[in-house]
Amino acid sequence: MKLLNKLAAVAIVATALFTACTEPAPISYTLTGILPDSSFNGQEVILRENYTRAIIATDTVEGNKFVFEGVADTARYCYAQVKNTRTFADLILENGNITLDFNAERVLPTGTGLNDILRDIYAVCDTIEKENMEAVSAEWFAKHGNDIIGIVLYGSPLFFTLDADAQIARLEGMGEINKEKEFIKKEISRLKARKATEVGQPFTDFEGKDAVGNTVKLSDYVGKGNYVLVDMWASWCGPCKREIPNLAEVHNLYKDKGLTVLGIFVWDDIKNLQPAIEEEKITWAQIIDTEKVSTTLYGVSGIPSIMLIGPDGTILERDAAVRGENMKPTIEKYLLKK
């Protein structure tokens, strides 16, 4: 009951504040970031809008702090980051004096009404029971589907802990202002593609090139009687490289026992493929996809993305079940079953 009362109180305040903050008058702001020590002095800080990554302003750290001042036409969900570091924090850029204290254990913005709500969202997400997440998420998105708080919710556990059906429902239920944002449109499309290629669905075919430039299809490998372990990867991707020993192990063990390992080279320049193959000692076939066709069709938001497809073309497993230490046992579950 206390949690629901907290949510109700925050929702009332959010509604009142957003009404005040959507007046057409320009927004003037001062954003001050306080950094822990002088080692940051001289470094560049970038203020960007979340999701679009559009740069709003830059500053240089002096005296262990940075300051952004300006005028914006509406409240925006942003983040400030010391360039090329993991020192960053989210905030809502709005009228008033906003402070980010990087000495805090958890850096959250203070000083303005909408940023107080952002802090409350984090607090609620930290304390809410998992079984209440769906109901609370539905309530908040219903109230804030067309304002800046709705965009904050989209980046919170009140969205990303939901299943794909609920996520699609939240985004499609947004008001036109938010739903017309390009990154929301893309996320709806991605989620629907992910849903269409989830475990139990038939594989979706696509074309790419092999290492010598010939056109090849996923169906050249899938549906031929073998289990196919598909790995979408790139040469610059650290987590992708960490999966290569696991892929090599199952490839060497089971390449003659009903398993085909297939790499899909994505989000990378074709010139990087051969050096990566040589460096990592990759011996399995590759499809080169420079047009992002495969990752779009399969709703992939990050790599590596690995899936196991059965002999009949049915998707059997995706991601966690065939990543890391789970890969070999999962493969063996299918290959060695009686």
Residue map of PLM features:
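N-terminal "domain-start" segment that seeds a small globular fold
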Residues: 185-220, 327-337
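Amphipathic alpha-helical repeat scaffolds of TPR domains
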Residues: 145-156
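Bacterial Sec-dependent N-terminal signal peptides
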Residues: 1-30
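A non-transmembrane, solvent-exposed segment enriched in polar/low-complexity residues
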Residues: 21-144
